[in-house]
A protein has these predicted regions:
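Rossmann-like adenosine-cofactor binding region
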Residues: 300-362
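Glycine-rich phosphate/diphosphate-binding loop of Rossmann-like nucleotide-binding domains
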Residues: 147, 154-172, 224, 230, ...
Length: 453
């Protein structure tokens, strides 16, 4: 499933209905239309740029032929704007200071920098003040679980890491540097991250396959004194919990008293179960074809269903993160259920089919995006200066996202032009019984809030 995006330059006669003919032709072959921009209006014609999305090269060819066959309409060019946008990469490292004189050089580099080095040597915490370390996150991947592409290697996964870095910068003013590791053994990844950790204020683990991701994150959280989070686990779980809170509010369902079923117990599924239990859901039931995954859920306090049918029959809320399109059958849907089929690009069941079968609420993964979570979570922990990201903090982040959602929406849209990204400070107190200490901190949680002009 390629999910190809192309931009068509289409010329139509300046007569009402011709744009509709083009849209109909695209829709008839299953293409999705994105942006439509008028490029030029001539004496008797209109030139438009039309962005379309299809699932395969064959479907793209069928779509192009359908547009070309329209009488009086000319398809001039077909371009890959996504590929063009990636030329040269999406991120860069630049100096914050201009160096235009000898005085500038002395302040920025030698000899002035020596005094700063000595100050940090005497008081290491001053590195957070006098360097970029305190506002810089490493995005670490081994390329074994890149989006829906699988084990394609770290270099092929670099565009994803650059995208994450760009979002960190634009949404939370956090510096983020992709770190590509050409190793696959957990102990090698752990040791490498430990070795480079002095240069960062936090570590975001990204697209590292299951089950290695669990060991890697747990070990790094134990052994490093900076916050570590695996986004495929906890970023996904935060936004999923926020979506469930919103869905329950709109339907009158008591989330904490509901039976929650999780189909698929990989990185995202296990973390989602743990997140719901941390929120206070009393009954969390999972299902996975892997005995090891099922055992992991039980070790965290969840239960395992004997079959998908049993889970569907008994659960009020069903979440699916399997990557298997059409896995959930319509006849399994129980009246009044909430269905969050979150796999991309195709869900386990289409929302329309779930609603038709009796679900009270249904959605797919297109609106449940990690971008609502990871930038603000790290902005929060970097501001607060905490060494660990706890479930208490993650639940607070999910609640902040849910509380900023407009009525009728599932979650906020972070890039809505009518919205601005703000931060709300929430005080978080939690007890670490293992260490027997009380830690009180401030967590700045990411949210998107309407500013009415």
């Amino acid at each position: 499933m390629n999910n190809l995006i192309r931009t068509l330059m289409v010329q139509t006669p300046t007569v009402p209905g011709n744009l509709g003919r083009v849209a109909t032709a695209i829709g008839n072959v299953g293409g999705d239309i994105g942006e439509v921009e008028t490029v030029k209006v001539g004496h008797n014609y209109t030139m438009r740029s039309i962005t379309v999305q299809v699932e395969s090269e064959d479907q793209l060819e069928e779509l192009l032929e359908a547009v070309r066959s329209l009488e009086g309409i000319t398809l001039h060019t077909v371009s890959d704007e996504v590929l063009h946008a990636h030329e040269g990469g999406k991120i860069q490292m630049k100096s914050k200071m201009k160096i235009e004189s000898i005085a500038d050089l002395r302040r920025v580099y030698t000899p002035g920098v020596a005094n700063v080095c000595r100050a940090i040597q005497e008081q290491p915490d001053k590195a957070k003040i006098y360097t970029s370390i305190g506002n810089t996150v490493a995005i670490v991947t081994d390329g074994t679980a890149i989006l829906g592409l699988g084990n394609i290697g770290p270099v092929a996964g670099m565009p994803v890491m650059e995208g994450k870095a760009a979002l960190f910068d634009q949404l939370a003013n956090v510096n983020a540097i992709p770190i590509l590791l050409n190793v696959n053994e957990p102990k090698e990844i752990i040791q490498t991250v430990k070795n480079i950790s002095p240069g960062f204020g936090g570590i975001l683990l990204e697209d590292i396959g299951s089950p290695h991701c669990f060991e890697i994150e747990e070990r790094l959280k134990e052994e490093l004194d900076i916050p570590v989070m695996h986004d495929d686990q906890h970023g996904t779980a935060v936004v999923t919990l926020a979506a469930a809170i919103s869905a329950c509010r709109s339907t009158g369902v008591n989330l904490k008293e509901a039976k929650v079923g999780q189909i698929g117990l990989g990185a995202a599924g296990i973390a989602t179960c743990r997140m719901f239990m941390a929120y206070g859901v009393k009954q969390v039931i999972g299902a996975d074809k892997s005995p090891e995954a099922n055992e992991r859920l039980v070790s965290y306090g969840g239960k395992v269903a004997d079959s998908l049918e049993e889970l569907m029959e008994n659960c009020d809320i069903v979440i699916a993160t399997t990557g298997v399109p059409g896995l959930i059958r319509k006849e399994w849907i129980r009246k009044g259920q909430i269905i969050l089929a979150l796999s991309n690009p195709k869900p386990e069941i289409e929302p329309e089919d779930a609603l038709e079968a009796g679900a009270i609420y249904a959605t797919d993964g297109r609106s449940v995006n990690n971008v609502l979570g990871f930038p603000g979570i790290f902005r929060g922990v970097l501001n607060a200066g905490v060494r660990d990201i706890t479930h208490t903090m993650l639940v607070a982040a999910a609640e902040a996202i849910a509380n900023s959602t407009r009525p009728g929406d599932l979650v906020p849209h972070p890039l809505n032009l009518k919205e601005r990204l703000l931060y709300t400070e929430r005080k978080t107190a939690f007890i670490d019984n293992k260490q027997g200490c009380l830690e009180i901190g401030s967590l700045v949680c990411f949210l998107s809030k309407i500013i009415r002009k």
